[in-house]
């Protein structure tokens, strides 16, 4: 087990002037489960492959523990990698697949068998040790691939979208198994995914990348509560945070027919940048619907006393998930039509085509600079 350090690590592919990974700076603690997440092409898999030694590092350094491994070959890094496709040998049994790396390393048969059986017990694979991969389900094959990594007892686990080939239900159960297994083994793990739900549920910390640049690295809770910029705010959360550009008024921001109070330091910071508007972020669950007796509207001042409080939302689609309902609608802001998602009780879902008015709850507003995208509120 060991710490992992990306020290301004950079990768520029031949023939390109733009780095695929640009000055990546992350310190990963011993035994930590860190998830790299971002859209396709953001550099997350490239970062993992740089750590594995499968990609050259053109600038900066990578360290595992006290060792600088920047230019070491993969075999000398003491890492084990699990891929999206399981890469099992079809002609070998499960036991032979799991122990193959140890066999190549010259470990004696008795020790190999002992380590394979221990890993199989952890992964509930004991009864399948004599089977061939074709006789296993997708989830079982993925566990065999993990077992092959476990028996090597590496300092660092690397996982590159290992759940992508599994169906939705199996993905949920397997991700909980991987997270609990990592906590039991205590081995430092770097996990790559494009699925932010996976990232939020599995990682001790999450690192969000975009266009090769690190946007934010933090605990899942802090990242959800305090996204560093507009990209993170829109990427983390399902459904995503609503982002609406609204004008600054005295003491707050104009939200439809209501004035929502905002931290004065945030408004001053926006004014200092020359912004006349700010981008307000509100999670779907942090709206009150006026027509459903939402209490937040009563605390806000209104521009026009005879008009309903808040922002008028035209309901286009209603999704009912059983426990909750989600309103997918459109709003008119500054002459532009914007999409908005609001979570409501499944017992009080409006009709499609209806118009409802929404206001954000006090203290649940995120304010971002419209010009730079950076977070302005604490």
From Swiss-Prot:
Residues in ABC transporter domain copies: 4-236
GO cellular component, one term: ATP-binding cassette (ABC) transporter complex, substrate-binding subunit-containing
Subcellular location, principal: membrane
Organism: Streptomyces coelicolor (strain ATCC BAA-471 / A3(2) / M145)
Family statement: Belongs to the ABC transporter superfamily.
GO-annotated biological processes: carbohydrate transport
Inducers of expression: Constitutively expressed.
Domain of life, per lineage: Bacteria
Gene name of the encoded protein: msiK
Null allele phenotype: Disruption of the gene severely affects the ability of the mutant to utilize maltose, cellobiose, starch, cellulose, chitin and chitosan, but not glucose. The null mutant lacks (GlcNAc)2-uptake activity, but GlcNAc transport activity is unaffected. Mutant shows defects in induction of chitinase production.
Enzyme type, top EC level: translocase
Amino acids binding ATP: 38-45
Entry protein name: Diacetylchitobiose uptake system ATP-binding protein MsiK
Cellular localization per UniProt: Cell membrane
Keywords: ATP-binding, Cell membrane, Membrane, Nucleotide-binding, Sugar transport, Translocase, Transport
Membrane-protein topology: Peripheral membrane protein
Stated role: Part of the ABC transporter complexes DasABC-MsiK and NgcEFG-MsiK involved in N,N'-diacetylchitobiose ((GlcNAc)2) uptake. Responsible for energy coupling to the transport system.
InterPro entries: AAA+_ATPase, ABC_transporter-like_ATP-bd, ABC_transporter-like_CS, ABC_transpr_MalK-like, ABC_transpr_MalK/UgpC-like, Mo/tungstate-bd_C_term_dom, OB_MalK-like, P-loop_NTPase
EC number annotated for this UniProt entry: 7.5.2.-
Assembly description: The DasABC-MsiK complex is composed of two ATP-binding proteins (MsiK), two transmembrane proteins (DasB and DasC) and a solute-binding protein (DasA). The NgcEFG-MsiK complex is composed of two ATP-binding proteins (MsiK), two transmembrane proteins (NgcF and NgcG) and a solute-binding protein (NgcE).
Any GO MF annotation of the entry: ATP binding
């Amino acid at each position: 087990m060991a710490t992992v350090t990306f020290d301004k690590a950079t990768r520029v592919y031949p023939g390109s002037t733009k780095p695929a990974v640009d000055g990546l700076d992350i310190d990963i603690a011993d035994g930590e489960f860190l998830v790299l997440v971002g859209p396709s092409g953001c550099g997350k898999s490239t970062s993992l492959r740089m750590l594995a030694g499968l990609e050259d590092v053109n600038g900066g350094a990578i360290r595992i523990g006290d060792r600088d491994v920047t230019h070491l070959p993969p075999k000398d890094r003491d890492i084990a990698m699990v891929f999206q496709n399981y890469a099992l040998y079809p002609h070998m049994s499960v036991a032979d697949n799991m122990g193959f790396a140890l066999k190549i390393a010259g470990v004696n048969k008795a020790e190999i068998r002992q380590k394979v059986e221990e890993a199989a017990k952890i992964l509930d694979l004991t009864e399948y040790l004599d089977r061939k991969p074709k006789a296993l389900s997708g989830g079982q094959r993925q566990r065999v691939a993990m077992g092959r990594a476990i028996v090597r007892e590496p300092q660092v686990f690397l996982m590159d979208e290992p759940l992508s080939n599994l169906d939705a239900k199996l993905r949920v159960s397997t991700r909980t198994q991987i997270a609990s297994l990592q906590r039991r083994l205590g081995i430092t793990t770097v996990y790559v995914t494009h699925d932010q739900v996976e990232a939020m549920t599995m990682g001790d910390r999450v690192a969000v990348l975009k266009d090769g640049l690190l946007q934010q690295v933090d605990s899942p809770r802090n990242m959800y509560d305090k996204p560093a910029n507009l990209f993170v705010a829109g990427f983390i959360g399902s459904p995503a945070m609503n982002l609406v550009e609204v004008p600054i008024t005295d003491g707050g921001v104009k939200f439809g027919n209501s004035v929502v109070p905002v931290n004065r330091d945030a408004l001053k910071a926006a004014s200092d940048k020359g912004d006349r508007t700010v981008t307000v972020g509100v999670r779907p669950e942090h709206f009150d619907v006026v027509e459903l007796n939402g209490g937040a509207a009563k605390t806000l001042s209104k521009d026009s006393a005879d008009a309903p409080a808040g922002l008028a939302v035209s309901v286009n689609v209603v999704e009912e998930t059983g426990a909750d309902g989600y309103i997918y609608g459109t709003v008119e802001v500054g002459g532009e039509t914007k999409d908005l998602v609001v979570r409501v009780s499944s017992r009080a879902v409006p009709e499609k085509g209806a118009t409802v008015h929404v206001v954000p709850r006090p203290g649940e507003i995120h304010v971002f600079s419209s010009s730079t995208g950076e977070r302005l509120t604490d």
